[in-house]
């Protein structure tokens, strides 16, 4: 069975047992009345069952309802169908004030019907020939308004300065000021020029997201013809069907696939209603993607530390133990489905580097947009500052130093011999984003 943990907030007067049973019925075989065609099938075999209910500590009138869905209710290899069943009509149910899907347990038999990520973490490392450290990226800013040539120039400067990747922003598709084909050409030029000068393999996440699946595939084909290593897709706005098609194309044609989660906070940010991001992360691993944005813990975007680490492990590891202290409701086994690299991006700069290195470890991409391009000396020195800071943190960690306690000291020591890093440290020494997260663990 597929197991689901729902956070249910019933309307006043509705007992939790009734609410839980209603969720299970509406998202499987039930409807609002008894119908004579019920007698033509075996409802006992196909109905969803609410098998356990527990109150949420510290929250009045909220319950975690566990529901089991027979596997035959779902089409094989279709994230789209899985979500249509589990989170379809039921979220508009009048008997509930709010409903949130907190976690899913996907049985090994169903996981095996998915291709998963096009390549996975180890194959990506081998393609890039980069080991033993997080990868560095940069989102090109301003996200909208640059011409293709200026955009390509910014990519080149960042890659030349020491970054591994640059990135199209999620809303860069094919607008009047910069058509997709022009952008692809200038970015490919930036990649090849910087590769020749640095001797390292470089990439730019070319956003293939488009208004139709056919147009999206056309862009992916053109990227492959240019010989670039990686493309990008907005998987929630583009849709799971389009994303799975693109992931299959990427595996068949040797392209890595970077996934942006634009629109996720509409779905996952409220604590009592929606779908938790750990479920969207599992869905992405099944649908297919080699990278996905996962929050930073320390930057400008929402993300509580233990919760973030919980779904980062769901993305990377092969086997995950149940751990309610990190928001993981079920033990799960990915049966050798390739892992996804989490991408930390959003309001981060060199002073965050020790924390990011400690939190995310080697199998991650640390992406500094403003934290690269906002350097007072320009894009290339911004890239140099980030690379120096990263190398210093990785070396310190490998020497056994405590990054959490000594992080600032490590950065200051490195800035003594790197003027680019010293300038970056000076610019961002006061920048903080200190707001309480909306989505926290239940205590």
From Swiss-Prot:
PROSITE patterns: RUBISCO_LARGE. It catalyses: 2 (2R)-3-phosphoglycerate + 2 H(+) = D-ribulose 1,5-bisphosphate + CO2 + H2O; D-ribulose 1,5-bisphosphate + O2 = 2-phosphoglycolate + (2R)-3-phosphoglycerate + 2 H(+). The modification N6-carboxylysine is found at residue 167. Its cofactor is Mg(2+). InterPro entries: RuBisCO (IPR033966), RuBisCo_large_chain_AS (IPR020878), RuBisCO_lsu_C (IPR000685), RuBisCO_lsu_C_sf (IPR036376), RuBisCO_lsu_fd_N (IPR017443), RuBisCO_lsu_N_sf (IPR036422), RuBisCO_lsuI (IPR020888). Keywords: Calvin cycle, Carbon dioxide fixation, Chloroplast, Disulfide bond, Lyase, Magnesium, Metal-binding, Monooxygenase, Oxidoreductase, Photorespiration, Photosynthesis, Plastid. Its EC number is 4.1.1.39. Mg(2+) binds at residues 167, 169-170. RuBisCO catalyzes two reactions: the carboxylation of D-ribulose 1,5-bisphosphate, the primary event in carbon dioxide fixation, as well as the oxidative fragmentation of the pentose substrate in the photorespiration process. Both reactions occur simultaneously and in competition at the same active site. The basic functional RuBisCO is composed of a large chain homodimer in a 'head-to-tail' conformation. In form I RuBisCO this homodimer is arranged in a barrel-like tetramer with the small subunits forming a tetrameric 'cap' on each end of the 'barrel'. Heterohexadecamer of 8 large chains and 8 small chains; disulfide-linked. The disulfide link is formed within the large subunit homodimers. This is Ribulose bisphosphate carboxylase large chain. The lineage of its organism: Eukaryota, Viridiplantae, Streptophyta, Embryophyta, Tracheophyta.
